[in-house]
Design a protein with these regions (language model features):
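Extracellular/periplasmic envelope-modification machinery, especially enzymes
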Residues: 1-191
Length: 191
């Protein structure tokens, strides 16, 4: 994907609605659109979706997504959303992975840029729970054990501790820079 990949339908609104929410991130962020679209249908907000597969939503000069992310900054400047939601499959971009990595300094730089552009509310969505192994295979293995009764509401065995570490790191960043933080990890794991 390049900087011209975003369809106009994602960023051009025809309503006079001054309240705009901009969703920025990768394909994991795109999952949030359906829920946000509810508010758009109700006429409360215009929702602008700028998501690109495997592109961390941070300003970083050293990634293949740099041109695309610069375009996001330009679109924020021109559309003036009141809220920007930043979300992604953060565990892919953790510094230990082989993907374009995201580090704390680049995330802070990105948030600072949004503030300079006049965004009044920035929401950082943290990582979702993940497991060391394939979750469906773990459930099949568990179902074959003598302890099996019913599928568990929550499965903590085999849970990736890296998710907890990353969630704590991102929550600390959000607190440090004064933005809202939503933790799917804490919500889904009843923490």
């Amino acid at each position: 994907q390049d900087a011209n990949s975003f369809s106009d339908v994602c960023v051009i609104t025809e309503s006079a609605q001054p309240k705009k929410i901009l969703l920025w991130g990768d394909s994991h962020a795109a999952q949030l659109y359906a829920g946000l679209h509810y508010y758009e249908r109700e006429g409360q907000y215009d929702v602008l979706q700028l998501t690109a597969s495997a592109c961390p939503p941070v300003i970083n000069e050293n990634t293949r997504c740099n041109g695309l992310n610069k375009k996001v900054i330009q679109l924020i400047a021109s559309t003036r959303p009141i809220t920007v939601i930043i979300s992604g499959h953060w565990s892919l971009y953790d510094e230990s992975k082989g993907w374009d990595h995201m580090d704390a300094a680049n995330l802070v730089k990105t948030i600072d840029e949004f503030k300079k552009l006049g965004v009044t509310e920035i929401i950082l969505f943290g990582p979702v729970p993940s497991w060391e192994s394939n979750l469906p295979k773990m459930l099949v293995k568990l179902s074959k054990s003598s302890d099996w009764k019913d599928p568990p509401d929550r499965l903590t065995s085999g849970f990736s501790q890296n998710t907890k570490i990353l969630d704590n790191k991102m929550e600390a960043i959000a607190k440090e820079v004064g933005i809202s933080y939503i933790s799917p990890y804490q919500t889904f794991c009843n923490l």
